[in-house]
């Protein structure tokens, strides 16, 4: 991170498996110095927290992409879940996601099975990026593939590695990616679906008698009542505010100067399946059966 070994170089294909959750405090000075170069360096979009440098590797890969008039590039990089959603609107991670999505660089994210790495069993994801989407069916789209259940158990674990992705699974994942169709484990979204505007909702400050506190004739916000809402980019903020806020707080208003655009990819939410709770009658019948069984067991004990 502190010493670009491929300065000025670009590549057709880039594969990367950066460390998960690795601090970059030791490289902070040089990284921040390069960030001042904007997109003339590797880190123009923003900087993540020093506790996790994954997205610095992601931006490094993006900076090595060939211009589209020279054939463009494709990237596959493995991350844990953190780069998908960490960071509020306006933060470094959110701004990095914003740069990727608003420039239509993200082709797909593939959720891998747990327990496929020696040192960790956490969830991991392959990000597939390309600057060659324009004019194709993928233009303006992102494909999410949930391959979490596509694995075979190892006969013997190696550290945390208990599962393998078989050749057949790899072929199937590749086919799903190539087909670019929606299914139970493949969903397709617009780039904009992952964006939102974080609005600040204010309520007026009132005195002990409930009267408005005014300053130069203007209502003053009560900071103790301040709240925020994330409004999807595809929604009109005014309509959202009138529907979701005003019915519950008729005196509220939006401080537009504080609005910020953010991006996140809550992957698991898109594949969540609601499971209805068991009927109460079924649960009660099971409890009665257990009580009957317990009563019989107690009788046997005391008969002894």
Where are these regions (language model features)?
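A conserved structural/catalytic subdomain of Rossmann-like adenosyl-cofactor enzymes
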Residues: 4-299
């Amino acid at each position: 991170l502190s010493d670009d070994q491929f300065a000025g170089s670009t590549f057709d294909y880039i594969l990367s498996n950066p460390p998960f959750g690795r601090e970059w405090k030791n490289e902070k000075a040089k990284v921040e110095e390069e960030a001042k170069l904007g997109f003339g360096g590797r880190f123009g979009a923003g900087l993540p927290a020093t506790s996790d440098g994954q997205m610095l590797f992601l931006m490094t890969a993006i900076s090595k992409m060939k211009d589209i008039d020279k054939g463009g590039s494709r990237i596959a990089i493995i991350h844990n879940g953190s780069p998908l959603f960490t960071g509020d609107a306006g933060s470094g991670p959110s701004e990095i996601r914003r740069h990727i999505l608003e420039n239509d660089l993200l082709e797909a994210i593939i959720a891998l099975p747990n327990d496929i790495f020696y040192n960790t069993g956490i969830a991991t994801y392959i990000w597939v990026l390309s600057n060659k989407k324009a004019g194709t069916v993928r233009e303006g789209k992102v494909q999410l593939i949930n391959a979490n259940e596509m694995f075979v158990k190892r006969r013997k674990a190696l550290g945390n590695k208990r599962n393998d992705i078989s050749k057949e699974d790899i072929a199937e994942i590749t086919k799903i990616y190539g087909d670019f169709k929606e299914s139970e484990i493949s969903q397709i979204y617009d780039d904009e679906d992952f964006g939102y505007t974080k609005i600040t909702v204010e309520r007026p400050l009132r005195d002990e008698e409930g009267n408005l506190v005014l300053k130069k004739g203007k209502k003053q916000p009560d900071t103790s009542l301040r709240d925020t809402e994330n409004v999807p980019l595809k929604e009109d903020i005014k309509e959202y505010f009138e529907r979701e806020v005003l019915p519950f707080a008729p005196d509220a208003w939006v401080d537009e100067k504080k609005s910020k655009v953010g991006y996140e990819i809550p992957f698991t939410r898109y594949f969540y399946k609601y499971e209805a709770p068991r009927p109460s009658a079924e649960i009660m019948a099971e409890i009665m059966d257990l009580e009957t069984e317990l009563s019989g067991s107690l009788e046997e004990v005391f008969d002894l």
